[in-house]
Amino acid sequence: MSVPAALRTVTVIVAVVLATLGLTTAAQAATINYVALGDSYSSGVGAGSYIDSSSCKRSSKAYPSLYASSSGASLSFQACSGAKTSDVLNNQVGALSASTTLVSISVGGNDAGFSSVMQDCILGGDSGCKTAIANATDYVDTTLPGLLDTVYRTIRSKAPNAKVVVLGYPHFYKIGGSCSVGLSDTSRGYINGGADALDTVIEKEAANAGFTFADVRPAFTGHEICSGSAWLHSVTWPVDESYHPTAAGQASGYYPTFTAAL
């Protein structure tokens, strides 16, 4: 081989190596480092197919798992059943770092005492439900904003380079729907109103933090309890899965709402 030919061969080899390195670097740079924070609506309670035996009930059918599978994102799945804002701060945000590029979170319902409100509505009739919702709404309006502000500020501090998507909660009932027993439509309306109050505060605080709010209510319209095509469990066993999205609710409600916000 002549010297010029040899030089050309070396040049081609070097170019190929550099191109390969460049592709590798670009792929590494494009890796989505995703941390899923929050409560049972993000962990996937009610969707089944739980990843481990912990009480967090993280599901492979929850929207964080679905997104990681479809996008190839590296997922740190921190969301946990029953989590309040304090649990996010104490047990979850440690997974965040400057290399985190995407964060999702749903939180606030447990702080407002959602499970006890539902119990009061089931056992206390319209009057008891109205009182329970009023008390919860007062908490949501006066106390929850400060708690959310602390959580959101902490997320931004620990993950300064991340896009943050805050997901809300659906309406639970279709008014005038197919249910012939159980709560009255009056109580069902109170419960939906409580979800609206919660989402309003979450949306406002998310905007104040510069985060994106993903409203799941439109996606669940027509798929509430009593709709005949529900993506939410009514009272069921295990009882902690009551009033949580089914696998269909995660796949067709939360997941597309989340991805549309990216």
Where are these regions (language model features)?
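Catalytic His-Asp segment of secreted/periplasmic serine-dependent ester chemistry enzymes
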Residues: 170-262
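A short acidic, glycine-rich active-site loop
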Residues: 53-61, 127-143, 186-196, 240-242
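Serine-esterase "nucleophile elbow" of acetyl-processing enzymes
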Residues: 29-79, 94
